[in-house]
Amino acid sequence: MESLIQTYLPNVYKMGWAGQAGWGTAIYLTLYMTVLSFIIGGFLGLVAGLFLVLTAPGGVLENKVVFWILDKITSIFRAVPFIILLAVLSPFSHLIVGTSIGPNAAIVPLSFAVFAFFARQVQVVLAELDGGVIEAAQASGATFWDIVGVYLSEGLPDLIRVTTVTLISLVGETAMAGAVGAGGIGNVAIAYGFNRYNHDVTILATIIIILIIFAIQFLGDFLTKKLSHKS
């Protein structure tokens, strides 16, 4: 097997598994940036999406000022292409993590991108829930946190679905960040593949990204179906 790789994928073989330019390191950095960015941006996006619904006209906590601010912040970050967001937030990344390059620096703009995208997805999901369920909870004297629980439990299957979409989008943005210095599979594909005309490296990097996305999609579909059947 090793001899076959060495013969037909010589550049892939030369890179090895470990080390700064190894495949294992690249995969780890891609997953590291994806997971950490989603934890940070996903949490903020969930909270923002929830409050976009709660403070909207006719919402449980109707508040035009809060809704307007959240709506505009989300729209601004959604409107800026990610490659530009990387450049714009570079000074902020340096302020937060002490550097403007590398995986830790990339997590800052990635988190902002996830926040805006996921907030809109959550808003759409929760806004489409049956209003009668929320009204029934209010009529029974439910507290604020009880109502939040109703929103999240009723919308859980669709929240899993939009989480899947967000993660898939994030993997692509992580690869884009890698191409401009953050490391990971994107960096391997461009720096060690495309720029050096090592087509086997570029192709394998692409296949790895596709496999990661397929894995996320499979898990997301599985959880969505399972939770939908329970509900």
Residue ranges and their predicted role:
Residues 144-176:
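Transmembrane alpha-helices
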Residues 51-89, 110, 117-124:
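Cytoplasmic-entry segments and transmembrane alpha-helices of multi-pass inner-membrane transporters
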Residues 51-57, 203-231:
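C-terminal transmembrane helix and the adjacent membrane-cytosol boundary/short C-terminal tail
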Residues 1-37, 63-68, 151:
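Periplasmic/extracellular loop-to-transmembrane helix junction in inner-membrane transport proteins
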Residues 25-33, 75-78, 82-117, 201, ...:
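Loop-to-helix entry region at the N-terminal start of transmembrane alpha-helices
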Residues 173-203, 207-208, 228:
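Glycine-rich helix-loop "coupling/hinge" segments at transmembrane-helix boundaries
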Residues 23-54, 163:
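Transmembrane alpha-helix signature in integral membrane proteins
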Residues 126-155, 195:
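Short helix-to-coil transition segments within interhelical loops
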